[in-house]
Amino acid sequence: THVLEQYMTYPNGAILQDRFSESVLQTIIDVAPKVLKDPTDYNAASNFMWSCTMALNGLIQKGVPTDWAVHAMGHELTALFGIDHARTLAIVAPSHYKFNFETKKEKLAQYGERVWNITEGSTDDKAHAAIEKTVAFFHDLGIDTKLSDYTQNYEGTAEEIAQRFTDRGWLGLGEHQTLSPDKVEKIVKMSY
């Protein structure tokens, strides 16, 4: 999701930046299952690691809006439950996209078309299908996407994270800086 946080906002005319992100995502979709099947597959592993480098070296975020709210929520799940970073992002991201659907649907549909080859349906249909394809991909990799898959002690987690954000003064996350702690609470609850 490190790529998605620098991509999944709204269309802003940064064609090359979008294509960089989309190519990284397509490469990960192609090679991640191969790496899991055979970690000694040097070609797959090297392409996977190069994709990881591109996800975090700062290139794909240049000149585009970013949304690191999924990261902020995911880090809290790691702190509270010891769930590894990638898994917490897979827990939060689908709920984040569903909660913020109206502001993200254009980019979600673009992602669906360009990364997942979803060509049928309306913008809304493509956007919803893209979220579902992403969840299915996580599952194919053996990554669960609900907090309840990792712990039975999840009740109250959303409220605790919202309070932590309030205490830190994190009152407006996301690309529009409108994701308040009460909205974070709703997203985390959707992730149960």
What is each stretch, according to the model?
Residues T119-Y192:
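C-terminal charged capping/lid subdomain of soluble metabolic enzymes
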